[in-house]
């Protein structure tokens, strides 16, 4: 051997702490928020993360001499203090691209977060952000269609799209489920939706639901003259079953299907995305289980990382929270990962939680979906925050209308069109929200009743996971 092999244990920072390293354009960069055990130096903690998420092990091994370890290792090249947090720090790590299989989000996450989170030297660890190099992005399939293709397919332009989740989300028979879909779509919504946990239960088998939903869509299209859709959830316990459900939706002439991408897994999601592009189907993505992973401010994976990974894995729509509704998410953070879903280039901006410049090249964008505890009074804020390339989904805010789901849908449609008209006329939606909505309600009894019904409903809880610059 040309090099001497010295058996034993040495500190991680001797190999993986490289403050003089300048990251390459082809490197995959990651920012971790680290909280080490008491007495362990920051450099050792950060280097341990770099080692355990790349080539390292706890002991020197002879087989290191069989490869160029210095080429393949992850390198911690910078450490920063976390604003307002004396215990934690940011570790910036560069990984050579050859560590990862081309186009495999599964492989990237297995490396970066697969084992290191159980490391004893750490009290907490959170993956805050990833900068994917263009060479990796070009190897990924991405959204099966993208924003423009979806608008063309649905023939809907110049405004956010409207949707709602069918309620109650569990317990309805297939026929009654289809009836609720029909009421919502004829009332003015663009989409209705299966909830994340409706698959194929004893009270409603999936074939039965798909058939009645297809009938509801066709009837509502005939009545309204508009293209309609329903997110048919094809998530299943096996890939074979998932594709069987997707094929049946295609046979029924449905424009869009749905997948729970975290519980279903990135491998299944990427495969389904490829199938959708090949078969001309839109793909709606639900983020069920995300808060288990992303809500703790010191441990887990930030949702901006999951959003980036989803854009690479594939999906045309992704739930992002609402800012104003019942679910977690402050305004600036939400805007940050909405940018990651839709824009072709997102600059580093710590005020929005983006730690790196991210160039998406020509990869299509993803519709941001606002869903969870929203109603007509929220419409001006939602249009302001999310813009046109979004889907605004009102579940209880549709079905809870005193006159029923069709009236709730009509109220939402009138409120949306009033806000878009006011915005296009140069009015300030959030400052003039009450005037805009009450003016529209003079010509819509459905909206007037909705405004009265939900005038006192607010979700004013403090956000648990705040941007560190706010702390």
From Swiss-Prot:
Additional detail: The basic functional RuBisCO is composed of a large chain homodimer in a 'head-to-tail' conformation. In form I RuBisCO this homodimer is arranged in a barrel-like tetramer with the small subunits forming a tetrameric 'cap' on each end of the 'barrel'.
Active-site residues, as the UniProt record annotates them: 167 (proton acceptor), 286 (proton acceptor)
Binding sites annotated in the UniProt record for Mg(2+): 193, 195-196
Source taxon at top rank: Bacteria
GO BP annotation list: photorespiration; reductive pentose-phosphate cycle
Phylogenetic classification of the source organism: Bacteria, Bacillati, Cyanobacteriota, Cyanophyceae, Synechococcales
Protein source organism: Synechococcus sp. (strain CC9605)
GO molecular function, one term: magnesium ion binding
EC class (word): lyase
Reactions mediated catalytically: 2 (2R)-3-phosphoglycerate + 2 H(+) = D-ribulose 1,5-bisphosphate + CO2 + H2O; D-ribulose 1,5-bisphosphate + O2 = 2-phosphoglycolate + (2R)-3-phosphoglycerate + 2 H(+)
Protein family membership: Belongs to the RuBisCO large chain family. Type I subfamily.
Modification type N6-carboxylysine: residues: 193
CC cofactor note: Binds 1 Mg(2+) ion per subunit.
Subunit field text: Heterohexadecamer of 8 large chains and 8 small chains.
Keyword Heme among record annotations: no
Subcellular location: Carboxysome
Function description: RuBisCO catalyzes two reactions: the carboxylation of D-ribulose 1,5-bisphosphate, the primary event in carbon dioxide fixation, as well as the oxidative fragmentation of the pentose substrate in the photorespiration process. Both reactions occur simultaneously and in competition at the same active site.
Protein's name according to its UniProt entry: Ribulose bisphosphate carboxylase large chain
EC number: 4.1.1.39
Residue numbers marked as site, Transition state stabilizer: 326
Any one cellular-component term (Gene Ontology): carboxysome
Keyword match Repressor: no
Major localisation: other
Key words of the record: Bacterial microcompartment, Calvin cycle, Carbon dioxide fixation, Carboxysome, Lyase, Magnesium, Metal-binding, Monooxygenase, Oxidoreductase, Photorespiration, Photosynthesis
């Amino acid at each position: 051997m040309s090099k001497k092999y010295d058996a034993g244990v040495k500190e991680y920072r001797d190999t993986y702490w490289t403050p003089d390293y300048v990251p390459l354009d082809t490197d995959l960069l990651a920012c971790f928020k680290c909280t080490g055990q008491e007495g362990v130096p920051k450099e050792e903690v950060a280097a341990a993360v770099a080692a355990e998420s790349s080539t390292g092990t706890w002991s020197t091994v002879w087989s290191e001499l069989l490869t160029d370890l210095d080429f393949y290792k992850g390198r911690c090249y910078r450490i920063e203090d976390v604003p307002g947090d004396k215990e934690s720090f940011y570790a910036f790590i560069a990984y050579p691209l050859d560590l990862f299989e081309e186009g495999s989000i599964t492989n990237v996450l297995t490396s970066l977060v697969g084992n290191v989170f159980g490391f004893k030297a750490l009290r907490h660890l959170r993956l805050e952000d990833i900068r994917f190099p263009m060479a990796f992005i070009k190897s990924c399939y991405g959204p099966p269609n993208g924003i423009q293709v979806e608008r063309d397919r649905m023939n809907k332009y110049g405004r956010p799209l409207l949707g709602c989740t069918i309620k109650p989300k569990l317990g309805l028979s297939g026929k009654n489920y289809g009836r609720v879909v029909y009421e919502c779509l004829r009332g003015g919504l663009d989409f209705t939706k299966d909830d994340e946990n409706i698959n194929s239960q004893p009270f409603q088998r999936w074939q039965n639901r798909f058939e009645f939903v297809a009938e509801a869509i066709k009837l509502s299209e005939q009545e309204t003259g508009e293209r309609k859709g329903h997110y048919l959830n094809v998530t299943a316990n096996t890939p074979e079953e998932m594709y069987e459900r997707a094929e049946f939706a295609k046979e029924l002439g449905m424009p869009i299907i749905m997948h729970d991408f975290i519980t279903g897994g990135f491998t299944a999601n990427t495969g389904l995305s490829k199938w959708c592009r090949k078969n001309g189907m839109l793909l709606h993505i639900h983020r069920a289980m995300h808060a288990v992973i992303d809500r703790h401010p010191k441990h887990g994976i930030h949702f901006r990382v999951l959003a980036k990974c989803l854009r690479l894995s594939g999906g045309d729509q992704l739930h992002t929270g609402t800012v104003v509704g019942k679910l977690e998410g402050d305004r600036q953070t939400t805007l940050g990962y909405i940018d990651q879903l839709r824009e072709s280039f997102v600059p580093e901006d710590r005020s929005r939680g983006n730690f790196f410049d991210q160039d998406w090249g020509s990869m299509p964008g993803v519709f941001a979906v606002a869903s969870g505890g929203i109603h007509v009074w929220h419409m001006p804020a939602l249009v302001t925050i999310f813009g046109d390339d979004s889907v605004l989904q009102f579940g209880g805010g549709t079905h809870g209308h005193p006159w029923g789901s069709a009236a709730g849908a009509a109220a939402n449609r009138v409120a949306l069109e009033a806000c878009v008209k006011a915005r296009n006329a140069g009015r300030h939606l959030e400052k003039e929200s009450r005037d805009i909505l009450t003016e529209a309600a003079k010509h819509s009894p459905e909206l007037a009743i909705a405004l009265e019904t939900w005038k006192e409903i607010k979700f004013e809880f403090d956000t648990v996971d705040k941007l560190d610059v706010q702390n």
